[in-house]
Amino acid sequence: MKLNEVEAAANVAAALAAKAAGARRRIAIISDHASPLAAPGSVDCGGQNVYVAQLARELARAGHLVDVFTRRDAPEQRQIAHWLDNIRVIHVPAGPPRYVPKEQMLPHVDAFARHVTRFARRQPAAYDIVHANFFMSGMVAQHLKTALGLPFVITFHALGRVRRLAQGTADTFPTERMRIEAALMRAADRIIAECPQDRHDMERLYGAPHSRIAITPCGFSPDELWPVPMPEARARLGLDEGRFIVLQLGRMVPRKGVDTVIQGVAMLRHRYGVDAQLLVVGGDTGGHGGDGLELARLRSVAADLGIAAHVRFTGQQPRAVLRDYYSAANVFASTPWYEPFGITPVEAMACARPVVGAEVGGIKSTVNDGVTGFLVPSRDPAALADRLARLHRHPELARAMGEAGRRRACEHYTWRHVAAQLAAIYADVLDTARPAAPAAAYPN
C-alpha cells in the first residue's frame, strides 16, 4: 500500500466536509467494552477507548450531540453520566456489573441491544446516525437499524480473521466472530477502515464492497500532546539525563510484541554497547489477571536477558503525563504482530520523537520509513536493535526525524481532522436517509 493513500482519502473526506457544515446531528456511538472514561493502558483499555473519547469530544466541539453507549462494568456507575458539554456516557446494564473480558461478552450483546433500543425510543428526538465500534457494537447497531430504521457506520478496530491468522489458537474469541463481521460488512451503510491495509483485509478476507469502505485514520489531540524539552520531562519523571531511553507504551498483551522491544534493547546494550534504558508504560494494576500474567512474563524475559535493572515497568499512567514520557524518550518503539492502526506511534510523532515500528497494519502508513522513523519486520529484535543503534549514533538524524514526524502528525492526524472526516461521512450516508428534526441541546 502506498503511503499517500491515507492523505488521498483525507483529501476526499475534506471535500465532503461542506455537507456536514452547519448541520447539528444527534449521534449514538456504540462502544460495548471500551468506555471513553476508562484509564488508558488498563486491562482491555487501549486505542479504541482513546478513539471513542476523542471522537466524541471533537464531534461535540463541532456542535453535534453525542451519546456514548458502553457496558456497565462497576456497580457504582450511574446510568447516565453527563461527561462534557453535549456528551453523555450511557452505562448499559448487560451482564454482571463488573469487568468481563471482551472475549466473553458475546452472550450479553442481546441484552445490551434491547436496552439501547428502549433508551433510544424514550428520547425526545431520534438519533440521526449510529457509529458502532467493534463487531459486538455492530450487532447492536444492526438491531437499531432493524428496530428503528437508523443508519449505521462501523469501525471494527480489529478483524477476527486477521487476529486468528496472527495469533492462531491463542485467539480466544468465539469462532462465530468472523461470520458476524462478514454480515455486518454487508449491512452497514458505511465501513470505516483505519488505514489502507485495513481496507485491503476487509476486501480480501471478507469480500467487503469497496464502494462502501472509507479510510479515516486515528489521531492525536494537540491540546494534550506536544514536545516538551527533554531535560524538563526527564527531571519530572526522575530519569537520568544522559542515558539513551527507548519508550514502549500500550497494553500488556502478547500481540503487542513488547518482548521484541525488550530483546531489541538487550541487543542494543550487549551488541552495540549503548547505555540504553527501556521504559514500558501501560498495564493494569486492578488484578484482573491477563495483564498481570503478561507483565510477569515480560519481567522474566528482561531478567533472562540480563537487563532487568535497565527496564522500568511504570504501569498505567494518566494521559496528562504521557507527553512527558514521550518527550523524555530518545525514540519510541512499537513492534506488534499486527496492528489495525496504532495510535501510540502517532502520539510519539506529535511529541517530535522518531518511531521505530513494525511494518504492519496502520503503522506502515503512519510512519514514513527513513523520514519520520524506521519500519522493521515484526518479531525481529535484531532489526530493531540496528535501527535504534543508528539513531543513537546519529542524534541529528533522530532530531530531524522527530521534527518531520511532528509535522506529519499535525498535518494529517489530529482528532479534529478525523472528526471532520467522519462528520462528512455521516452527512454522505444521511443524504439517502430520512429527514430529521432540528436537534436540541441535552438538559444538564
Per-segment meaning from a language model:
Residues P354-G357, V367:
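Short hydrophobic beta-strand element within catalytic cores of glycosyltransferases
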